[in-house]
Curated annotation (Swiss-Prot):
Gene3D superfamilies: Helix-loop-helix DNA-binding domain (4.10.280.10). This is Transcription factor ATOH7. InterPro entries: ATOH7_bHLH, bHLH_dom, bHLH_transcription_factors, HLH_DNA-bd_sf. Pfam families: HLH. Transcription factor that binds to DNA at the consensus sequence 5'-CAG[GC]TG-3'. Dimerization with TCF3 isoform E47 may be required in certain situations. Binds to gene promoters and enhancer elements, and thereby regulates a transcriptional program of retinal ganglion cell (RGC) determinant genes. Although the exact mechanism is not certain, retinal transcription regulation by ATOH7 has a role in RGC determination and survival, photoreceptor population development, targeting of RGC axons to the optic nerve and development of the retino-hypothalamic tract. It is found in: Nucleus; Perikaryon; Cell projection, Axon. Forms a heterodimer with TCF3 isoform E47; interaction may be required for DNA-binding in certain situations. GO terms for cellular component: axon; chromatin; cytosol; nucleoplasm; nucleus; perikaryon. Residues 40-92 form the bHLH domain. It comes from Homo sapiens (Human). Keywords: Cell projection, Developmental protein, Differentiation, Disease variant, DNA-binding, Neurogenesis, Nucleus, Transcription, Transcription regulation. Changing R42P: In PHPVAR; uncertain significance.
């Protein structure tokens, strides 16, 4: 911790009269300590936020590695990654639900493999295949995703 030594007032600042005995009041040192303490707390909060964001970005990177993204030359945004993960999970859920309706594994495997081919899986729900007017999520899942606005 810094020592409480007067460093001289800035130009044009009002100078408090010295306390009895020719020394500055103890309140000045306490004020400097409070400022230093606040600065330390701010630095600690910044470090915590930096670690939190690094953890969040690491989690998104790991999710991007497991979510299929055929034909993508660029890294998916966080929003696109979440949309792809949702679409992928829903497709897998649908396959498992329909698998329960069929007796053996061989009966249903061929029915759904086309959903995981490049031509049937899009970068994000709502994207269209070339020459297709129906939304992918509507065709695959039977629902229309609600529009989502990004806060700026």
């Amino acid at each position: 911790m810094k020592s409480c030594k007067p460093s001289g007032p800035p130009a044009g600042a009002r100078v408090a009269p010295p306390c009895a005995g020719g020394t500055e009041c103890a309140g000045t040192c306490a004020g400097a300590g409070r400022l230093e303490s606040a600065a330390r707390r701010r630095l600690a909060a910044n470090a915590r936020e930096r670690r939190r964001m690094q953890g969040l970005n690491t989690a998104f990177d790991r999710l991007r590695r497991v979510v299929p993204q055929w034909g993508q030359d660029k890294k998916l945004s966080k929003y696109e990654t979440l949309q792809m993960a949702l679409s992928y999970i829903m497709a897998l859920t649908r396959i498992l639900a329909e698998a329960e309706r069929f007796g053996s594994e061989r009966d249903w495997v061929g029915l759904h493999c086309e959903h995981f081919g490049r031509d049937h899986y899009l970068p994000f729900p709502g994207a269209k295949l070339p020459g297709e007017s129906e939304l992918y999520s509507q065709r695959l899942f039977g629902f229309q995703p609600e529009p989502f606005q990004m806060a700026t």
